[in-house]
Amino acid sequence: MFWIFVMAKPASLSIELDSDLDRRLSEIAEGMDQPKTAIIERALRDFVELRDWQDAAIDEGLRAAEEGRVFDHDKVGEWIDSWGTPNERPMPSRD
């Protein structure tokens, strides 16, 4: 048995960078012994992954609110304000 992997053809993108950003990018790439394109691709991939994570977290928060899985804002504020005081309060419960 053998496996055949088909790699997607890379897409190309043209961007214009201001001179300061281009200089910093060149310095970073040189310091990492990587081409600038690899640094840019990693940065874009990280941005997209972070955005995906943020969108999923927002969606989960909205679902939690719709289902009533939330804490009273004032009670949470009072709890946080009590931190580090002699009368620290326990974590509030969901009502």
Swiss-Prot record:
Disruption phenotype: No visible phenotype; its associated toxin gene (parE2, not annotated in UniProtKB) is non-functional.
Keywords: Toxin-antitoxin system
GO BP term, example: regulation of DNA-templated transcription
CDD domains per record: RHH_CopAso-like
Keyword Mitochondrion: no
Keyword Electron transport: no
Biological role stated in the UniProt entry: Antitoxin component of a non-functional type II toxin-antitoxin (TA system). Does not neutralize the effect of any of the RelE or ParE toxins.
Name used for this protein in its record: Orphan antitoxin ParD2
Species of provenance: Caulobacter vibrioides (strain ATCC 19089 / CIP 103742 / CB 15) (Caulobacter crescentus)
